[in-house]
Each structure stands twice: as C-alpha cells, then as structure tokens.
C-alpha cells in the first residue's frame, strides 16, 4: 500500500513537471493589479428517468448535484491573502432504494503570503474539511449504517513555510504544520495504539506539502489539479495524500461537462487508496 501511494504521487508530480514549461510561455508583461478579486462558479446537474409499462424493463431514477467553487484574493504590494471555498452536495434515488447521498463537500482554505522575492516567499495557511449531511453505508442485508455526519469527521491544518511560484499557473509550498482530526461518534480520531480508550480528537505535528496547477488547455477547456501531502512526525513514513483533479469543458455559455477524480490515502481511515470519480454535464454560471 505504501509503494502504491508513492507511485500515485510520482505520477501526479510528473504531470506537474511536464505542464509547467508550457505554462511558463503565458504573457507576464501585464503589471500587477492590487485589491480584492473574486470568482464564484456554480454548477447544477440533474438526471431523471421514468418508466411506464416499459416492456424492456428498467428502474426509475432521479439524481441531482449542486457545486459552488469560489476564490477571494486580496493582493497588496507586500502581501497576498488567498481564500478558496468549495462546496458540493448531491443525491440520487434509484427505484425503491430511497434517497442516497452521492456528493458532500465542505472545503475551506486560507493562505497569507509575504512577498520577499519574485518566486520564493514565506506563507502561513489554514484549512478545514468536513461535510454537510450524515453519510451511510448500505450493507446487502440489514438496515443502513451511519458512518459520518457534519463535523464528524472534521480535518483542520495550520502551517507555515515557504511557497514557490515560478509561473502564475503553478505554485507549491512546503512547511511545518499541525493537523487536527475531530470525531465525536465515529472514531476517525481514535488512536489504535491506545486500545483501552477512544479519542475524539487528535493533534499531530508534521511536514506539509501542497502543489496546485491550473491550465487553460483550450479556449473552452481547463484543467486544475491539487496535491496535498502531510506526514506526521510520529509516523513520518506514512504520507497522508489528497489529490483533486478536474477537467472542465464549456459546451456553451451555460453548459459545462466536468470530469473530477479525487484520490485519498490515509491509513488511519482506510488501508486502501480511496478513489472518487465524477462525470457530469449541467448548468454552470459564473457569479463573479
């Protein structure tokens, strides 16, 4: 499992390595524009299928998803304060199964950078990841089992270090950080080494690395990728990896096709690498 995680990380790093030279060719002649800038993009997807006396068979189905992706940045001559927020929620109903959750995302990040040089600068950052609604597992026999809910679990980090940004499309940072996990009922913060008690919170110091790449592949096609790595001092050989990759193609002014692949490797939560893939077409609107 550890070797597989290293292979996944290596592939993502190679993507960054080949993409950066192309990004470096973009126009940098424009001068800086200071002040607040905001961007908010909302996406709505929906699918409905209904059968009446259909001889070939089939199941009635209804699925919907709502996503909001925003950024707010305050750029000043000596500092840059970047904030990002990603929210998503979706449900589906297939036949008589009832409504089930298919997407649930609550992701906040804030980073303050002090400008000391053109490419290398110190930073301080904080993140929060959780979900909106309860999550369930559905065994083949028996009732559904609740396995998560709002702020259970909640993952938070605070870090400080150095950020390197050679071009506008790519940046990577490395630093020291704290990582907290909160879990009141479902044991996500429990330490398996203490068998006699169940911890509801954990705090670990460690090393953080975050790399982000945003590319305009075509006039209507964009690619974004974010790789987050955290290794605690207690288990320095166990790298917690989160990878979020999206290709979006604008079919028309308000219709977008999007492919998103998320990878998560955290041995304390699951012994295997978790993979989530979403292919959706729906309405997309840029608010700001």
Give the location of each predicted region.
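Transmembrane beta-strands of outer-membrane beta-barrel pores
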Residues: 44-50, 76-78, 87-93, 128-134, ...
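Residue-level signature of outer-membrane beta-barrel architecture
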Residues: 70-74, 114, 164-166, 211-215, ...
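Outer-membrane beta-barrel "beta-signal"
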Residues: 275-288
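Outer-membrane pore/translocation modules
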Residues: 99-206
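Repeated loop/turn-to-beta-strand initiation elements of outer-membrane beta-barrel proteins
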Residues: 78-81, 119-122, 169-172, 217-223, ...
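Transmembrane beta-strand segments of Gram-negative outer membrane beta-barrel proteins
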Residues: 32-48, 79-81
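Extracellular loop and loop/strand-boundary signature of outer-membrane beta-barrel proteins
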Residues: 52-58, 93-98, 141-148, 193-199, ...
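Membrane-embedded beta-strand positions of outer-membrane beta-barrel proteins
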Residues: 40-42, 83, 124, 160, ...
